């Protein structure tokens, strides 16, 4: 598999995570580290197109994950990315959100480095594991909804955005259930032509 656009240099992992408002695309979830600000803008673009093409979110709200909401807060690379993003007309950039807002659904697309995103993802997985160890499976409608929503194995895998085909990343600790779900997810992505739609959008915007 190759990149959909020569201008889109570093395909990120677009991971769908549950929130209080529905679903959010987090990008990058671990494919890259030490990204520069223009690469984070690419991530925002790819995540926005993915949210639109696959989740059906019109004009998705895009936010940077940061240690504060203020424009001048956080690492220099995040501050630079902020300045770049607020001047991109075709991205609905709403600014920074803090870690406590992630699961509350403060945005439709959450942009961060692959290093940070992978930590966030595994914290969410750890939350589910801890809950399951403390309370087990709760056989009620609410308990079943909780398991269905938060069991990371149900996601199966996450899509590499910006390729000219379907590339799925599965978890290193995936069991049979997770691999089964990953195969189903790959089928859904491929049959819906997600990679092609993303590629067409990216090529037109870059």
Question: What do these predicted ranges mean?
Answer:
Residues 1-27, 105-206:
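Glycine-rich phosphate/nucleotide-binding loop
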Residues 33-99, 108:
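Glycine-rich phosphate/diphosphate-binding loop of Rossmann-like nucleotide-binding domains
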């Amino acid at each position: 598999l190759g990149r959909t656009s020569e201008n889109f240099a570093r395909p990120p992992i677009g991971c769908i995570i549950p929130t209080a408002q529905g679903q959010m695309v987090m990008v990058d979830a671990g494919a890259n580290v030490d990204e520069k600000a223009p690469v984070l803008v690419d991530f925002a673009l790819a995540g926005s197109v993915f949210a639109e093409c696959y989740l059906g979110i019109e004009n998705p709200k895009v936010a940077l994950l940061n240690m504060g909401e203020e424009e001048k807060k956080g690492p220099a690379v995040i501050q630079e990315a902020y300045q770049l993003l607020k001047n991109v007309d075709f991205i609905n950039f709403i600014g920074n959100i803090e870690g406590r807002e992630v699961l509350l659904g403060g945005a439709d697309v959450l942009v961060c480095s692959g290093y940070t995103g992978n930590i966030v993802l595994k914290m969410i997985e750890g939350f589910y594991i801890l809950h399951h160890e403390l309370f087990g499976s709760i056989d009620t409608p609410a308990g079943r909804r909780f398991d269905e929503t938060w069991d990371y194995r149900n996601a199966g895998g996450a899509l590499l955005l910006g390729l000219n085909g379907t590339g799925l990343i599965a978890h290193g600790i995936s069991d049979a259930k997770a691999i089964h779900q990953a195969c189903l997810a790959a089928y859904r992505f491929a049959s819906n032509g997600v990679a092609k739609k993303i590629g067409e959008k990216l090529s037109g915007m870059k």
